[in-house]
Amino acid sequence: SGERPWKCCDLQTCTKSIPAFCRCRDLLEQCSDACKECGKVRDSDPPRYICQDVYRGIPAPMCHEHQ
């Protein structure tokens, strides 16, 4: 647990357990300072990154509302 590695996430997958284990697959211009394991997306131009961390706790809100 601790600080969530992302403030919000559109492509989030979480387990149904309590607390949930969540991953965020959003493509980012850069990972947040809270992200411990930041992976570069291969062949991305401009460069994009995914935070590889697994967060245990309350799922993050979505960054963008899907209309």
From Swiss-Prot:
GO cellular component, one term: extracellular region
Site label Reactive bond for trypsin, positions: K16, S17
Disulphide-bonded residues: C8-C63, C9-C24, C14-C22, C31-C38, C35-C51
Keywords: Disulfide bond, Protease inhibitor, Serine protease inhibitor
InterPro entries, A to Z: Bowman-Birk_prot_inh, Prot_inh_BBI
GO molecular function, one term: serine-type endopeptidase inhibitor activity
Keyword Disulfide bond in record: yes
Pfam family, one: Bowman-Birk_leg
Family indicated by similarity: Belongs to the Bowman-Birk serine protease inhibitor family.
Record-given protein name: Bowman-Birk type major trypsin inhibitor
Species of provenance: Setaria italica (Foxtail millet)
